[in-house]
């Protein structure tokens, strides 16, 4: 059967369900696909298909994730749901499934639980821009005051991690009722209300081409009589012939002008996000540029050596280390296109980090790298990946 053509007539947004085990994330995911399919067309995905999510390998890490899609009046959504807590941790840290926003599911009868807190913290650390809350299983709570108490508790928890706890929409309902097509007031209607809140509260992500120009440099060539050409895939933004750009990272930042852009040996006026290009740069010698630096819009990105990060350390089964690491561990940190050695400083009270753990660390690199909060990296030893991380805060 031929694949359906993807109709891009609505803006696209990536979301996911997060929250404590058994609070109803997968049931809610199934309920959203059902209700949205009834209202806007599309196909419902049943619970069993989401629950037995296939295992994927992303950067050597085994992650189970289920992907579903649906649409509302305003947008087309791709939605991820993970069966296990470990899958969430890995998914969020590696960025395997990008989230422009998340739906936090909290069981009204239990209130926030340890993983509720951990998923909110992870969302903060990895830069999920906005959350919306679904207070699930409200039919199991008879006492209105108890519901209000749980809502208050959730808001306080969100505020504690710098989300806008006072104003985040909290929708109350029962995902199971919606899925089973009963009690519409807490079932179907709550799902419609939830998706309206998601439409309004989760900002439309900026498309990569609308962001500032950045291209990680993969290779450098010298073309006699023409000068130096750097090649790479444009990550964000657009570069036009004649634009002034900066070369950032590893060495001192230098300014240059792009005098030519080519793709597949054809000359272009511009290169944009997603294009693999060669950029001819003026007045820069072959030995002045190297793989691992980036070409960027002047002033848009700065080089740093010290940062804190949220990392996941691969388990032995995933091909990671067999033994823990301790303070002063010095692996390579692989950013975009290159490895830089760095020293790991562990948080107070943490003696060691075991394979399979996730932990917040501080890192001191021996050379500066162009970085922003939210940048992903791999941790490597002798060319093999032993961990994955995301920059949560730049310190120097």
From Swiss-Prot:
Mg(2+) binds at residue 26. Residues 60-64 are annotated as: G2. It is found in: Cytoplasm. Keywords: Cytoplasm, Elongation factor, GTP-binding, Hydrolase, Magnesium, Metal-binding, Nucleotide-binding, Protein biosynthesis. It catalyses: GTP + H2O = GDP + phosphate + H(+). GTP binds at residues 19-26, 81-85, 136-139. Its main location: cytoplasm. Residues 10-206 form the tr-type G domain. Pfam families: GTP_EFTU (PF00009), GTP_EFTU_D2 (PF03144), GTP_EFTU_D3 (PF03143). GO terms for cellular component: cytosol. Belongs to the TRAFAC class translation factor GTPase superfamily. Classic translation factor GTPase family. EF-Tu/EF-1A subfamily. This is Elongation factor Tu. It comes from Erythrobacter litoralis (strain HTCC2594). The lineage of its organism: Bacteria, Pseudomonadati, Pseudomonadota, Alphaproteobacteria, Sphingomonadales. The gene is tuf.
